[in-house]
């Protein structure tokens, strides 16, 4: 247990959400001495922003001097502490996020969807989310040569969008 990475989460009031308070500073000092992460989060703010649409949420977060909601920070830090990453699959009807361990090979990642995908894995059409956003269209990105064919030894990267080719 002592070798596990830990994250300390301090629930603070709204006015302390960006800079913390005297109690969160004590926790920060301790955590830093142990090389651990500290996240300050206001449950009250998180509750309020859960009721807002995206534009209102962003405006409210900015008005508080925060970069992003505390819950987003907690999720990202949690993924990091657990060595997890996310890849996506997308089709005409749905886009789905899949959680995997970092450095998972493409066939094992495909196996998260269905074991037949792992057994019959051939290749994966792959583009990173940030590259796709530049083109705003999968076909345009593919035409520009940004979609890669990756094989069995490819380590899936956080934010990859993948279309698996496999034999049944």
Regions found by a protein language model. Give the residues of each.
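C-terminal-of-GTPase-core extension/linker across diverse P-loop GTPases
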Residues: 1-157, 167-168
């Amino acid at each position: 247990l002592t070798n596990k990475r830990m994250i300390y989460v301090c629930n603070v009031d709204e006015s302390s959400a960006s800079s913390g308070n005297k109690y969160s500073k004590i926790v920060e000092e301790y955590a830093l001495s142990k090389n651990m992460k500290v996240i300050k989060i206001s449950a009250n703010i998180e509750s309020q922003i859960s009721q807002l649409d995206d534009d209102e949420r962003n405006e409210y977060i900015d008005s508080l001097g925060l970069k992003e909601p505390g819950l987003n920070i907690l999720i990202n830090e949690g993924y990091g502490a657990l060595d997890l990453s996310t890849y996506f699959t997308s089709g005409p009807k749905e886009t789905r996020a899949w959680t995997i361990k970092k450095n998972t090979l493409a066939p094992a990642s495909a196996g998260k969807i269905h074991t037949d995908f792992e057994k019959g894995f051939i290749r994966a059409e792959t583009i990173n989310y940030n590259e796709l956003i530049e083109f705003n269209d999968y076909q345009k990105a593919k035409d520009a040569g940004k979609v890669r064919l990756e094989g069995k030894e490819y380590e899936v990267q956080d934010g990859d969008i993948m279309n698996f080719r496999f034999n049944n």
